UniProtKB/Swiss-Prot annotation:
Entry-listed glycosylation sites: N43
GO terms for MF: serine-type endopeptidase inhibitor activity
GO CC terms of this entry: extracellular region
Residues carrying the site annotation Reactive bond 3: L16, E17
Annotated protein name in UniProt: Ovomucoid
Keywords: Disulfide bond, Glycoprotein, Protease inhibitor, Repeat, Secreted, Serine protease inhibitor
Gene3D superfamilies hit by this protein: 3.30.60.30
Subcellular location: Secreted
Length: 54
């Protein structure tokens, strides 16, 4: 199981750093910040599928 530590999120500003992650919703998130904000909005139902683009 691949995991990402999302403690400290959500945050209001994310960098534009490109380190893509693929979520369980089959959506590519540009970086950990964007992914973790989406996890927070989903109340924890969104999980990491794998690192890299979907």
């Amino acid at each position: 199981v691949v995991t990402v530590d999302c403690s400290g999120y959500p945050t209001h500003a994310c960098t534009l750093e490109l380190k893509p992650l693929c979520g369980s919703d089959n959506q590519t998130y540009s970086n950990k910040c964007g992914f973790c904000n989406a996890v927070a909005q989903s109340n924890g139902t969104l999980t990491l599928s794998h690192f890299g683009k979907c």
